[in-house]
Structure formats: C-alpha cells, structure tokens
Amino acid sequence: MVETGAGTNTPPQVNRFQKFGLSMQVFMLRRGWMGKASDFLLVITTKGRRTGRNATIPISYKMDGEEIITLNPGNSNWFKNVLAAGSAILEIKGRKFEAVGRLVTDEKERRSIFEKYRTDDPKIFERLFRIPAVSPEEELLRVLSKWKFIKFTKR
C-alpha cells in the first residue's frame, strides 16, 4: 500500500492520477462537496490485516433500512480487511461511525440485494455492474456470481 496526500492508502499498481483522484474524492466527500455522488459514495477506513495501518478509500454503498450495503468482486484490500477485522470506520454524508461488517452468503439475500441495485437506479446499476439493467436473467445471474456484498450495521 502507498500513502497518498489525503490520507488514503491505495494498492501500488494504481497510477498517480488514480491515487490523486481517490484522494480528492475522500477530501470532497468528507466536506460534503460531492453533491448527488454522496448518495452512493462513502469513505471507508479499514485496519490493514497484515500491516496494521489504517487505509482509507471511497467506495459505493446503498442503504437497506438501517443497514449499509457495499459491494466488491472480492479482491480489494478494503474488502479483505473488513473480512479479517469484522468492522470498519464508515463516513456517510459527514457522519463518522464504527460499523460491523458481515459477508452476505445466502443466495436469496444476494439476489435480493442485486435486484435492489437494478431497480432503484438503473444508471448506477449499469455503471457499477457494467451490464444493462434490462439484460436477460442468465446474463444478470452471470454478473451477480462475480460480486460479493458486505452488509454493515452501526456499532
């Protein structure tokens, strides 16, 4: 992990421009300067499972009642760190709190979350999952199989 200017840690393979962009997103999200993007982007801080250092990055989220849903293909450091530690610090629209994360493994629940993303905002769905929201069921299930979800609850 490489420390960047705004306190975010990013994998070394991420180029300088991307690191700067992530740092700016964190900076702007923390100040409420991201407009509508703050409706689907949060700031997450995790403790490194190997280094023990804090790592901060913006990620997408969706509210499900009192729970916060995040998604990942499963290969990001923040995702692995949450699974290892079981918790993270989340910042949503200026509110910072500790949250407990749980990997969603139940297939019915995974499909329900995926469908919620698809129907709530098809444009965001298409940007996140890179597939049209009106795709055939078998294509949607193929894409779903590549994604993992973590549900957070405030501690």
Where are these regions (language model features)?
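Amphipathic alpha-helical interface surfaces
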Residues: 57, 75-78, 110-113
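A short mixed-secondary-structure module that forms the rim of ligand-binding clefts
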Residues: 62-91
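Short beta-strand segments
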Residues: 39-73
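Low-complexity, charge- and small-residue-enriched intrinsically disordered regions
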Residues: 30-42, 48, 130-131, 148
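Short conserved beta-strand and strand-loop elements enriched in small hydrophobics
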Residues: 44-45, 86-98
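Extreme N-terminal tail/first-helix region
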Residues: 1-34
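Charged, gly/pro-rich active-site loop segments
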Residues: 2-13, 95-155
